[in-house]
């Protein structure tokens, strides 16, 4: 039994959910998201809850059961509350600026990095903290990982771009011979 898959998802007020041909459609205001289950699981809407059930009893069906339930829950959370990731920039001369759909990064290279944000994602910069917001958990995480990948934190001084809650394991530098 999938412990995640058997939990129903409560549909919040203001969110319209419909199921057509194994495709879940979520709508709230101008947000419209779809989740195609590709026929791997049975989906029903009962008493204001989305209920998932596996198609068969094999291992693959049970895996899809929990996966699609988690994906649907992330969509509901995304269109109601949204997702955020925060990145912190450490280093002399390292800066960031949000200019519309472009995130401009100065990370010690000879050139500026102009990162174009995908649709549905917005970024804001407050001193040395970059906040990435969006309604799709996967896209927000992907953008944060790509921005961090431009200059990952190094273990000696901790310079670079890191997640705000991330802890960098520091190394001792060279010691002189006596």
Swiss-Prot record:
Matching entries from InterPro entries are given as:
Ribosomal_uL6-like (IPR000702), Ribosomal_uL6-like_a/b-dom_sf (IPR036789), Ribosomal_uL6_a/b-dom (IPR020040), Ribosomal_uL6_bac-type (IPR019906), Ribosomal_uL6_CS (IPR002358)
Which processes are annotated in GO (biological process)?
cytoplasmic translation
What does the sequence similarity comment in the record state about its family?
Belongs to the universal ribosomal protein uL6 family.
Subunit text: Part of the 50S ribosomal subunit.
According to UniProt, the name of this protein is Large ribosomal subunit protein uL6
Which is a Gene Ontology cellular component entry for this protein?
cytosolic large ribosomal subunit
Q: Please name the PANTHER family in this protein's record.
A: 60S/50S RIBOSOMAL PROTEIN L6/L9, LARGE RIBOSOMAL SUBUNIT PROTEIN UL6M
Domain of life assignment: Bacteria
**Function, in words:** This protein binds to the 23S rRNA, and is important in its secondary structure. It is located near the subunit interface in the base of the L7/L12 stalk, and near the tRNA binding site of the peptidyltransferase center.
- Keywords, alphabetical: Ribonucleoprotein, Ribosomal protein, RNA-binding, rRNA-binding
Q: Which GO terms describe its molecular function?
A: rRNA binding; structural constituent of ribosome
């Amino acid at each position: 039994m999938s412990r995640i898959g058997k939990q129903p998802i409560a549909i919040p007020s203001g969110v319209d959910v419909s199921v057509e041909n194994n495709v879940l459609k979520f709508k709230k205001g101008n947000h419209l998201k779809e989740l195609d289950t590709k026929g791997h699981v049975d989906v029903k809407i009962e008493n204001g809850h989305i209920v998932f059930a596996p198609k068969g009893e094999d291992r693959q069906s049970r895996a899809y059961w929990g996966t699609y339930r988690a994906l649907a829950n992330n969509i509901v959370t995304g269109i109601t509350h949204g997702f955020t990731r925060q990145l912190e920039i450490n280093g002399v001369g390292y800066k960031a600026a949000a200019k519309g759909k472009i995130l401009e990064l100065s990370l010690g290279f000879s050139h500026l990095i102009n990162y174009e944000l995908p649709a549905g994602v917005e970024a804001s910069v407050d001193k040395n903290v970059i906040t990435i917001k969006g309604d799709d958990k996967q896209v927000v995480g992907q953008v944060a990982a790509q921005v961090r990948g431009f200059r990952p934190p190094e273990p000696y001084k901790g310079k670079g771009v890191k997640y705000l809650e991330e802890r960098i394991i520091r190394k001792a530098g060279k010691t002189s011979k006596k």
